[in-house]
């Protein structure tokens, strides 16, 4: 996966070629794991992933940073926050919640629903990606004359976390209004 992409980027400079101008890759808000501080910041510690998915996203960030440092490849990681919209992933909570409501089954909610999620519409994700693509991290040297890795990480979300119980209530109301539920 990402290792092969990074290797391709590295070798794009072979034989005096111009090479990759800017690698932009998808990461995830899942890297924040059990962090309690809200809002999340890219400066927050993300060393304790709570899933294999989060661990792979964090390892991708570490590899991209290493390649930026070792090979001076401009790279930017984008931590997406719960993306929704047309053609959304069927494993996302809102699809699962909708299916459970349609089947008359109970939705299992942890922590009494006292958690918040930042839902981000896919068009906003696309806008963020396009903006970042146009602005690669600058290649520059530090005071010691050595290159500073041209590497950045950004959070891409809507900056308005929703309470999970409120989300389920609104989902149910909208499904009733749309006559999907009785």
Where are the predicted features?
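Conserved active-site region of classical short-chain dehydrogenase/reductase
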Residues: 3-7, 91, 123-126, 130
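Solvent-exposed, non-membrane alpha-helical residues enriched in polar/charged side chains
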Residues: 6, 65, 98-99, 130
